[in-house]
Amino acid sequence: MRWYPWLRPDFEKLVASYQAGRGHHALLIQALPGMGDDALIYALSRYLLCQQPQGHKSCGHCRGCQLMQAGTHPDYYTLAPEKGKNTLGVDAVREVTEKLNEHARLGGAKVVWVTDAALLTDAAANALLKTLEEPPAETWFFLATREPERLLATLRSRCRLHYLAPPPEQYAVTWLSREVTMSQDALLAALRLSAGSPGAALALFQGDNWQARETLCQALAYSVPSGDWYSLLAALNHEQAPARLHWLATLLMDALKRHHGAAQVTNVDVPGLVAELANHLSPSRLQAILGDVCHIREQLMSVTGINRELLITDLLLRIEHYLQPGVVLPVPHL
């Protein structure tokens, strides 16, 4: 896993809390995708399991460090869903918690990393909760999450929340400019599309992601003046439809911002398209379309086995209906 420079302040702050005896036994780390929370947790784990730490760092030479580097440390436990599953079950949690009651194999600390706490089943969360309420000595837990509110309230209450905030925007753009050759506007747009996460922004430039966004923008540039929104189906009906609907939603939001005179927009690399949307669609129509786009996106992400093509087709035909004169628009449900 890759270490990112913006992780250092958080790493040093957390290590200092352990050094001062104020480190919480269960740390709930909230971070956006691409922020590097996995690398932060791994670095903290290496520090806690190091037998001869040097300042804020693990030594890299002791038996504990060697085993961590080899991926075979007997006192380091990773809790993640089994391959092919999207939940973390109670059996895996119980297997680890039983081992935690034993003496540490290397005689030092024990560390447990829950890679995505939101995937814990209720039974698994309750099993983990029992251990968090009475943790074994020298045992540290790291729970990663995108949305803490999805966790059981009792589980959250036993943890200390640490939010891994995105770095300042200009810092992130500078970092991105060293990683990929793109215009400053494209870098800034990717960063804002990723809610400020530099790692997620970089991922947009990998594979065919950015080309897919450009294709969507080109299709939208045709559909807006022509009124043929159904022509967007090919650009949206894809296994990555939630991401593409997110791109569409940000363009609609930027057009709304333009109506209201807001200075900061997300899609700074396509100002002409944003202006076209604002010129052709009133604020009320933009709000109605935006509400439906967000609703469909949520359905695609939360309902298993849903017919994606049918759902998106219905969305696009409904948008065309909204453009007809005299149509009563729905109340926005954002």
UniProtKB/Swiss-Prot annotation:
GO terms for cellular component: DNA polymerase III complex; DNA polymerase III, clamp loader complex; replisome. GO terms for biological process: DNA replication; DNA-templated DNA replication. Its EC number is 2.7.7.7. Keywords: DNA replication, DNA-directed DNA polymerase, Nucleotidyltransferase, Transferase. It catalyses: DNA(n) + a 2'-deoxyribonucleoside 5'-triphosphate = DNA(n+1) + diphosphate. InterPro entries: DNA_pol3_clamp-load_cplx_C (IPR008921), DNA_pol_HolB (IPR004622), DNA_pol_III_delta_C (IPR015199), DNA_Rep/Repair_Clamp_Loader (IPR050238), HolB_lid-gammaproteobact (IPR048731), P-loop_NTPase (IPR027417). GO terms for molecular function: 3'-5' exonuclease activity; DNA binding; DNA clamp loader activity; DNA-directed DNA polymerase activity. Transmembrane segments: none annotated. Part of the beta sliding clamp loading complex, which hydrolyzes ATP to load the beta clamp onto primed DNA to form the DNA replication pre-initiation complex. DNA polymerase III is a complex, multichain enzyme responsible for most of the replicative synthesis in bacteria. This DNA polymerase also exhibits 3' to 5' exonuclease activity. The gamma complex (gamma(3),delta,delta') is thought to load beta dimers onto DNA by binding ATP which alters the complex's conformation so it can bind beta sliding clamp dimers and open them at one interface. The DNA polymerase III holoenzyme complex contains at least 10 different subunits organized into 3 functionally essential subassemblies: the Pol III core, the beta sliding clamp processivity factor and the clamp-loading complex. The Pol III core (subunits alpha, epsilon and theta) contains the polymerase and the 3'-5' exonuclease proofreading activities. The polymerase is tethered to the template via the dimeric beta sliding clamp processivity factor. NCBIfam families: holB, PRK07993.1. This is DNA polymerase III subunit delta'.
